[in-house]
């Protein structure tokens, strides 16, 4: 079914509560594991319906944040979402404590039961008012960012539409664009500080209500980190500082030389070529058609997937003034349908949507064939391997998008992927500092960010910019506001995707087989087990990062 034809009606959560209560009673009355699993199938049907309708409403609001009807629906789900989470929790608690646990664990898998345990540790009914407040604060941030009106080049632009000017080949244009963006954030600095301060206090209060010292423990549970913790993440970040930061700085210096500059400035970030970054040559329609050709040639599985997405119009990718910033893939379980949301703006980022977000969507499409819904509850550190690796697997088709600048794109993509890892680790370490010290003032948080920038991105020079030069860059990173602690996942995944890059250059067919296997494993096993099973090294293992850097050196000679 096409997305626009999918019917929508507001979910009546009082009715859902009754239905969930009935399922819990049926679990109690069941006389065997088999009977409980039959009840569990009804739970799948109920949660599929709720999640599908909530997701439709949220997508339609994101597509047009000025739509009053879906704004009201979005607010309704922000209020009712935590109530629903609590109903799910009550059901899962009953399942978790089942006398037929051995049968159910064999049927659903040990990962699902570990995740249920983490869910019990991350939520309680007492948190509902705080979670509702948290939702309204993140919505306030989203609306503030989506509502940016920046006069530039004779047009009124939002932040997504300003992006091409930030990487323009003309340094003067870049400087003006960065100054305009800085002015927007400076003008809204007080509101941004207030929203974040309230979020930190709110999340800390949630953690303390659950008996934790600070939000980190609660945040790790909420991110479903079921086979690693803070110590492993810190060890990984240390490896990045020791081996990857020097490698990334080498790449930045190579970029500086290519740009013919004596010194890099912040206005040169993510600019890779003197004559500008490669941009797609076609219209949005031509980019989508090229994507279809590419996925038809890549494999039978990707061909079937992309044709399904196109036939059912499961993309909304054109940038518009009142559209939410950013891009994502989400899933509509009733229709076994992934959905991709993005903001095309004429840069190479448009093609990244067709590779990165389609990597997520392809895995979601494959996972839909698994009747055990819990197998789709993927940790983000695994989910991002699917998307980031697809960016590399599709490289040989880049001529369809970039013409004679395809090789420039491939070089830029590798450098950008490598340069991202220190930034991602910095975002993670910043959040660890913030949540370990919730008493920090907005100014102290910015000082912490500036210190981390010197450690992770020593080449960076803000030239005294009044906003970015004062440690404010993180305020444009929506994950920090909306999805706390969701960022190191990208770094862990990128280290795996870079391993796939090395593997596919040695033997593409074998690398693709390994990737397909990982996609199909979904969340049926723990992250650390799955990456081992498909022949990848764990980023947590000592020496993993050093080994990757040594193999990547050959690409930058």
Question: Predicted segments — roles?
Answer:
Residues 1-278, 290:
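A well-structured
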Residues 114-117, 227, 354, 362, ...:
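C-terminal, non-catalytic "cap/extension" segments appended to globular domains
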Residues 122-123, 181-188, 228-234, 269-280, ...:
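Glycine- and acidic
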Residues 127, 131, 185, 189-193, ...:
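Hydrophobic alpha-helical scaffolding
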Residues 160-172, 280-355, 359-364, 466:
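Active-site-adjacent "gating/activation" loops or surface patches in catalytic cores
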Residues 242-243, 367, 378-407, 413-415, ...:
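Post-HExxH zinc-binding segment in Zn-dependent metallohydrolases
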Residues 255-274, 308-319, 379, 412-414, ...:
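A glycine-rich phosphate-binding loop feature that marks nucleotide/adenosyl-phosphate handling sites
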Residues 359-373, 393:
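Catalytic Zn2+-binding segment of zinc metalloproteases
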């Amino acid at each position: 079914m096409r997305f626009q034809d999918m019917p929508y009606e507001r979910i009546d959560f009082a009715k859902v509560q009754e239905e969930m209560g009935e399922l819990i009673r049926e679990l109690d009355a069941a006389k065997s594991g088999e009977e409980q699993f039959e009840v569990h199938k009804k739970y799948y049907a109920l949660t599929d319906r709720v999640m599908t309708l909530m997701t439709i409403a949220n997508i339609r609001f994101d597509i047009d944040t000025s739509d009053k009807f879906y704004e009201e629906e979005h607010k309704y789900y922000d209020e009712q979402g935590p109530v629903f989470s609590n109903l799910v929790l009550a059901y899962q608690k009953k399942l978790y404590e089942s006398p037929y646990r051995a049968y159910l664990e064999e049927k659903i898998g040990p990962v699902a039961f570990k995740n249920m345990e983490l869910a019990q540790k991350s939520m309680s009914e007492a948190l509902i008012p705080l979670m509702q407040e948290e939702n309204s604060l993140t919505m306030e941030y989203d609306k503030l960012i989506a509502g940016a009106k920046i006069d530039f080049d004779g047009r009124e632009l939002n932040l997504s539409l300003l992006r091409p000017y930030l990487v323009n080949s003309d340094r003067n244009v870049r400087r003006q664009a960065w100054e305009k963006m800085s002015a927007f954030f400076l003008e809204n600095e007080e509101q941004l500080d207030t929203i974040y301060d309230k979020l930190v206090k709110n999340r800390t209060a949630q953690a303390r209500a659950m008996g934790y010292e600070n939000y980190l423990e609660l945040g790790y549970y909420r991110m479903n980190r079921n086979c690693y913790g803070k110590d492993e993440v810190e060890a990984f970040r240390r490896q990045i500082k020791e081996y990857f930061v020097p490698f990334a700085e080498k790449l930045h210096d190579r970029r500086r030389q290519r740009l013919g500059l004596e010194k890099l400035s912040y206005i040169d970030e993510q600019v890779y070529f003197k004559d500008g970054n490669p941009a797609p040559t076609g219209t949005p329609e031509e980019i989508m058609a090229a994507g279809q050709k590419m996925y038809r040639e890549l494999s039978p599985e990707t061909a079937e997937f992309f044709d399904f997405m196109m036939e059912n119009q499961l993309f909304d990718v054109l940038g518009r003034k009142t559209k939410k910033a950013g891009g994502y893939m989400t899933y509509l379980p009733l229709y076994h349908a992934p959905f991709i949301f993005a903001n095309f703006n004429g840069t190479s980022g448009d093609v990244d949507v067709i590779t990165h977000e389609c990597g997520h969507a392809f895995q979601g499409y494959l996972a839909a064939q698994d009747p055990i819904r819990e197998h789709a509850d993927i940790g983000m550190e695994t989910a991002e391997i699917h998307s980031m690796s697809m960016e590399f697997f599709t490289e040989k088709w880049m001529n369809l998008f970039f013409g004679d600048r395809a090789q420039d794109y491939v070089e830029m993509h590798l450098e950008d992927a490598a340069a991202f890892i220190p930034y991602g680790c910095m975002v993670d370490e910043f959040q660890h500092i913030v949540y370990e010290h919730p008493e920090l003032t907005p100014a102290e948080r910015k000082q912490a960010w500036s210190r981390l920038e010197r450690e992770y991105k020593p080449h960076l020079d803000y030239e005294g910019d009044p906003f970015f030069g004062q440690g404010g860059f993180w305020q444009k990173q929506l994950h920090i506001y909306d999805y706390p602690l969701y960022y190191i996942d990208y770094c862990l995944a990128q280290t795996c995707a870079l391993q796939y890059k090395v593997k596919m250059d040695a033997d593409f067919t074998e690398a693709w087989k390994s990737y397909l296997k990982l996609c199909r494993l979904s969340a049926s096993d723990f992250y650390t087990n799955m990456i081992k099973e498909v022949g990848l090294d764990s980023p947590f293992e000592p020496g993993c990062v050093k080994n990757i850097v040594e193999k990547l050196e050959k690409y930058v000679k």
